[in-house]
């Protein structure tokens, strides 16, 4: 099944399922490792995979090099937007996950 043959709703569902599977795996890893290290590993894995994705869109090394700044700008903007949204979302449920209050 290609993404061209499925609806936007199906793509959204698959997207969310992939996200959940990455988070589930990260949570498993965080049981045995520091969450900070797991987060950094996820960032590195995402950057490595996205470098591969960018390379797949270029027909040759010259095209690849021409696309680098555009790709970097795109992924940085996407990450900033996603991080900002998730930080805001997490603020709403902070006390659910933290049973203590830090001194102000």
Regions found by a protein language model. Give the residues of each.
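Solvent-exposed interaction surfaces and binding hotspots enriched for charged
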Residues: 2-104
């Amino acid at each position: 099944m290609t993404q061209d043959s499925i609806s936007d709703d199906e793509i959204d569902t698959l997207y969310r399922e992939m996200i959940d599977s990455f988070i589930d795996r990260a949570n498993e890893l965080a049981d045995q490792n520091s969450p900070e290290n797991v987060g950094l590993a996820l960032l590195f894995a995402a950057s490595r995979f996205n470098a591969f994705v960018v390379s797949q869109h270029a027909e040759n090394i010259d095209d690849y090099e021409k696309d680098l700044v555009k790709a970097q700008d795109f992924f940085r903007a996407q990450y900033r937007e996603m991080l900002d949204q998730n930080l805001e979302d997490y603020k709403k449920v902070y006390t659910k996950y933290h049973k203590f209050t830090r001194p102000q």
